[in-house]
C-alpha cells in the first residue's frame, strides 16, 4: 500500500487538526494535534482546552498578530507523519 492510498483510506486524517483564518488573516486558530510554533513577531498568543460533546478534549492555539506562524502535526501509524511551520 502506497502512502497516498494509506492516507486516503483513513477517515479524514486532518479533521482534528484543521485551521481557519479570520479577521482579515490577523487571527489564526487551530484544533487538536496542532503544535504551536510561535509568532513571527509582535502580537499575542494563547491556548486553551475545549470540552467536546463526546467527552474528548481539544486543545487550541490562537495568535493575534499582523504576521503569524502556524504549525500542525499528524501521524498515521508509525510510518508517516508530517508537520509544517510558516509565516504569512
UniProtKB/Swiss-Prot annotation:
Residue numbers spanned by region Disordered: 1-22
Biological process, per Gene Ontology: sorocarp development
Matching Pfam families: Coiled (PF05710)
Family under the similarity heading: Belongs to the hssA/B family.
Name assigned to this protein: HssA/B-like protein 6
Organism, scientific name: Dictyostelium discoideum
Gene that encodes it: hssl6
